[in-house]
């Protein structure tokens, strides 16, 4: 067995683990969405009322479920949850998997070894890939699923193998359980498979194309139905992302976001984000497409359609006001560029396959003669490629694109430092290069963002020091997730996922509740269950509690906390 994929995976994993651990545990740089996933996973294992559905149904479950094996050790190593290290491990493994898939695509096409190494390294070392390969966010898992699906479909275009088609469907199904926007590449893949299957068949075209389409889409449909049905059975809402008080639609409304006044400006942001992440994509895309048409190479259509669907979906949702202006939403442009660079060199030979389909595209021999998966020498003859293009010209083009790819890395790094384009990434400069003497507004904002959740950790330490019995503190996790993961005793908190949360909230004295953690009843705080039950809790204790402590917040976008003591407790 070729050890190269294992080496690529191991090296990438170590890189992302070290980087992620340094940023989180070393520099306290924590992403809110990542930490909330850790909190949800912890609640499923170590809350007062541990159960799997505590991970919630607002967001897709796979990012949290993948962390369960690591969170299980947090009672012995609290830093796993306190610093979100379970998310770091999860993202490191899956981003390394995405890197390995890019390597595998080059190998499957028979690309020169130097090109495989260079393109894989450029992808793995992209600043956005490194950052999101170790911060616990869903991007790593989503990219892995997309790259896996792209690789398998690129193989299927050649092999017509059912194994490749089913694997691509599984990858897309898992992608949906990672991010809802995986439906976009799934739909694009369905159209692609139906069209390719219909065109290359000589008999029973429609029936065969429908069968191939069903094999691909079945795992996605199963994931969609099972997740929606489970959510409906447990919560009464099939799509909490859109209907829940905690869902994305509610978050947009509570945050004051809406449809942009000028859709053209919103589209310009999306284009700018893609150019930051993939500066050479406008050059590479038409060149790769033209070469594919000239060679009659159908493989480049796969990454163009699938990753293009992701980017188009993100652009559309931002233009219509359904999402935020986050640079990370356009990260699919990075693997798209890397894979297109690999397709500049014509494919050589044939990918190893366990079982070829009837319509396998094997150059120079029949499918039965190639069932062993051995490689054919390819289409190259003399100094020409299969398209008649001089081999030297293709090599020069690949070298030039590789140089441009390397040169694009600092462009992405500089773009990540833009306060306008990269609102979640630009604080990295303050994290990596602290400068107390810098008095600029930009640095002050970056430092405040970098300090996010520091107050919640101090609050958790204070509450731990009180040595309260289980179930003593009622708190919603809208903002409180950061307090929960930082506490050594999460069972002291009564949270919405607990089956008796409403009873404790309605009768705190009878249920042994001693404290209530309150946030302002404004912005996202309007969705806080405590504010919905007691609208004046933050202002005056709602006549059931007295103010014990007020905690001003050092972090950006975080509320000033108030700790109330329940009267009669």
Regions found by a protein language model. Give the residues of each.
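Transmembrane alpha-helix segments characteristic
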Residues: 10-15, 117-118, 123, 221, ...
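Transmembrane-helix motifs of polytopic, lipid-linked glycan transferases
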Residues: 86-110, 148, 152
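Hydrophobic, aromatic-rich transmembrane alpha-helices
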Residues: 2, 200, 272-304
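Short acidic/glycine- and proline-prone juxtamembrane loop motifs at membrane-interface regions
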Residues: 56-59, 128-141
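Membrane-lumen/periplasm interface segments of specific transmembrane helices
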Residues: 19, 195, 199, 209-286, ...
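Signature aromatic-anchored transmembrane alpha helix within multi-pass, membrane-resident enzymes
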Residues: 6-10, 191, 217-221, 296, ...
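Short periplasmic/luminal acceptor-recognition loop of GT-C membrane glycosyltransferases, typified by
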Residues: 411, 445-493, 515
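Perimembrane helix-loop-helix junctions
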Residues: 2, 152-161, 185-221, 291-296, ...
